Amino acid sequence: MARIAGVNIPTNKRVIIALQYIHGIGPKFAQEITEKVGIPTGRRVHELSDAEVLQIREAIDQGYQVEGDLRREVAMNVKRLMDLGCYRGLRHRRSLPVRGQRTHTNARTRKGPAKAIAGKKK
C-alpha cells in the first residue's frame, strides 16, 4: 500500500480512484495531479514506482490542502461564524440547517431523532 498524505491508498485500484480516498481530493483534483505528474489514466497503484509515488506526494504537498489541515480549516471557519454571532453561526450552534432549508418537517438528519411530545388524547 502506498501512503500519501497520511492515508494508505488501496493498491489494486486505478491511481485516479485511489487518490480520492484522501480527504480533500475529488475526481477533478485527482485528474489534475495525475496529469501534472504524467501518469497514464489506466495505471494501477501497485504498478507505480517509488519515484512516481514521491512525485504525487510532492504535487499534493505543493498545491493542495488535504486531510488534517483541511478539516482544521473548515472547523475554524465554522467556529469563526459561531463566535461572530451571525445568522449562520447561530444555526450551527443550534444544530439546525444553515442554508435556508425547511425545518417544520424534514431536517431530521441535522436535528437528530424526533422528540416525543404529549398530545391530546381522543
UniProtKB/Swiss-Prot annotation:
Annotated segments matching region Disordered: 97-122
Question: What are the protein's UniProt keywords?
Answer: Ribonucleoprotein, Ribosomal protein, RNA-binding, rRNA-binding, tRNA-binding
Gene Ontology biological process terms, A to Z: translation
Q: How does it assemble?
A: Part of the 30S ribosomal subunit. Forms a loose heterodimer with protein S19. Forms two bridges to the 50S subunit in the 70S ribosome.
Q: What does this protein do?
A: Located at the top of the head of the 30S subunit, it contacts several helices of the 16S rRNA. In the 70S ribosome it contacts the 23S rRNA (bridge B1a) and protein L5 of the 50S subunit (bridge B1b), connecting the 2 subunits; these bridges are implicated in subunit movement. Contacts the tRNAs in the A and P-sites.
**PANTHER family in alphabetical order:** 30S RIBOSOMAL PROTEIN S13/40S RIBOSOMAL PROTEIN S18 (PTHR10871), SMALL RIBOSOMAL SUBUNIT PROTEIN US13M (PTHR10871:SF1)
Please state what the protein is called: Small ribosomal subunit protein uS13
- Look up and give the organism this protein is from: Bartonella tribocorum (strain CIP 105476 / IBS 506)
